[in-house]
UniProtKB/Swiss-Prot annotation:
Gly residues bias: start-end ranges: 183-192
Stretches with biased composition (Basic and acidic residues): 217-227
Similarity-based family: Belongs to the universal ribosomal protein uS13 family.
GO molecular function, one term: structural constituent of ribosome
PROSITE patterns named among the record's database cross-references: RIBOSOMAL_S13_1, RIBOSOMAL_S13_2
PANTHER family: 30S RIBOSOMAL PROTEIN S13/40S RIBOSOMAL PROTEIN S18, SMALL RIBOSOMAL SUBUNIT PROTEIN US13
Keyword tags: Ribonucleoprotein, Ribosomal protein, RNA-binding, rRNA-binding
Protein name from the UniProt record: Small ribosomal subunit protein uS13
InterPro entries named among the record's database cross-references: Rbsml_uS13_C, Ribosomal_uS13, Ribosomal_uS13-like_H2TH, Ribosomal_uS13_CS
Gene3D superfamilies reported in the protein's UniProt record: 1.10.8.50, 30s ribosomal protein s13, domain 2
TM annotation in the entry: none
Length: 227
């Protein structure tokens, strides 16, 4: 006997599946309007217009099978907290696949990323506060991060500040200790047995042979008295 059909839960992720199932005449629960799946467990296929394999946001191609909160993190400058805040403000399910986002939702995400402060994001949530050129609080993404950091380092070097001095010589900038890490000199060689190799011409070097015909060196030691 065939197993009874399974009634799928009503979730935002499956909203489009229910709409497609209604169009194709699939079995629906008369009480809740949920989609029934037979014993095979196959879902109705979505058309190419509803699901997108690649979604482009801010010049980044995001795979459609990724969850929204995971896919947005592939954009440089967006972390987990920022991605979650974006989806919460726009009322988008975190677990929904990016491929199911509509064009309007994608446009709203890009609009919010261009001006997060205007959307109500707090100042401490942004990664570029009180910009030296404009004085504005903004959030930068992708290649703008590298460009901005490079300009900041160059400005410190030109101004001759202590930060610029450390950057110029490739040293640590933020007060880290450099006794063990951050060294650049060559390694000191040690002989087998743990003894340090003697320096050339030092105390451990063998005495040089006396030149032929030369008088032996005089010693200042006193002569012993004969008994």
């Amino acid at each position: 006997m065939r197993s009874p059909p399974i009634c799928m839960k009503r979730t935002p992720k499956l909203a489009r599946i229910r709409e497609t199932a209604r169009c194709k005449g699939a079995d629906l629960c008369p009480a809740s309007g949920r989609v029934f799946i037979g014993a095979s467990g196959k879902r109705p296929r979505l058309s190419a217009q509803e699901y997108k394999h690649i979604v482009r946001i801010l010049g980044n191609d995001l795979p459609g099978e990724k969850k929204a909160v995971v896919g947005l993190r592939q954009i440089r400058g967006i972390g987990y907290g920022f991605a979650t805040a974006i989806l919460d403000v726009l009322k988008i399910d975190n677990n929904s696949n990016i491929g199911y986002l509509t064009d309007e939702q994608v446009a709203s995400i890009e609009k919010l990323l261009q001006d997060p402060a205007g959307a109500g994001f707090p100042t401490w949530f942004l990664n570029r506060r009180k910009d030296l050129e404009t004085g504005e609080d903004r959030h930068i993404f992708t290649s703008d991060i590298e460009f901005t950091v490079r300009n900041d380092v160059e400005r410190e070097r030109v101004s001759g500040s202590w930060k610029g001095y450390r950057h110029m010589f490739g040293l640590k900038v933020r007060g880290q200790r450099t006794r063990n890490t951050g060294r650049k000199g060559g390694a000191v060689g040690v002989a087998k047995g743990g003894k340090v190799m003697p320096a050339k011409g030092g105390a451990g070097a063998p005495p040089q042979e006396e030149a032929a015909g030369a008088e032996p060196a005089k010693t200042d030691a006193p002569e012993e008295k004969k008994a």
